[in-house]
Regions:
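Residue-level signal for alpha-helical context at structural boundaries
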Residues: 57, 114, 173-174
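A short acidic, glycine-rich active-site loop
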Residues: 61-67, 119-131
């Protein structure tokens, strides 16, 4: 029943929610003018450490940072206490598992040059490149995915990894920066 109420609350905030959303705790949502956040069918958003013993440190955060940005989460995807921030576009495929406290972002948040870094006076100084996570990807707990990354379908990224470059489909990747460890034979 609470999930139905939370789905209705998300819809009232402007989130496009397909049927079957399950929530544990309340996610935090930030929409921008002309932006879109969409949740596919049967998504699970776990914002409570009571529902995930891996240690959810904060609620699921779905944030658009600039007008017209998009954040799309595919059908049957489960998220535990992660932050998903889109200045342009973040797209997560179907059947993904995203471990506790992951961060997926398509931007640097601040300018790299010292002038304006603190207050972001010029948004164009902040680097942004779309992020795509294809179907059936598993991101372990505390994984960070940075701007411009594409993760191929059926790939697993080990806990604590920092993904700075795109990864092919069907591999196990780990490390900071994440590197391919091996191919996953049985997919």
């Amino acid at each position: 029943m609470l999930s139905l109420c939370r789905a209705a609350s998300l819809r009232l905030k402007g989130v496009k929610v397909k049927p079957g959303l399950v929530t544990y705790g309340s996610p935090i949502v930030n929409l921008t003018k002309g932006g879109l956040i969409s949740l596919g069918e049967n998504c699970v958003l776990c914002s409570s450490s009571r529902a995930n013993f891996a240690g959810v440190n904060h609620p699921v955060i779905l944030a658009l940072l600039r007008p017209g940005a998009t954040l799309e989460i595919g059908d049957d995807t489960g998220i535990s206490g992660g932050s998903f921030c889109a200045a342009r576009s973040v797209k997560i495929g179907k059947g993904c598992l995203i471990g506790a406290n992951a961060l997926v972002t398509d931007c640097d948040f601040h300018a790299l040059k010292p002038e304006g870094r603190r207050h972001n006076s010029n948004p164009e100084d902040v680097g942004c490149e779309p992020v795509v996570i294809e179907d059936n990807v598993w991101l372990g707990a505390n994984v960070t995915v940075l701007k411009g990354v594409r993760i191929g379908r059926d790939t697993v990224v080990a806990a604590g990894s920092v993904v700075t470059k795109s990864l092919p489909e069907g591999v196990l990747a780990a490390g900071a920066p994440a590197k391919v460890i091996r191919e996953l034979k049985e997919r």
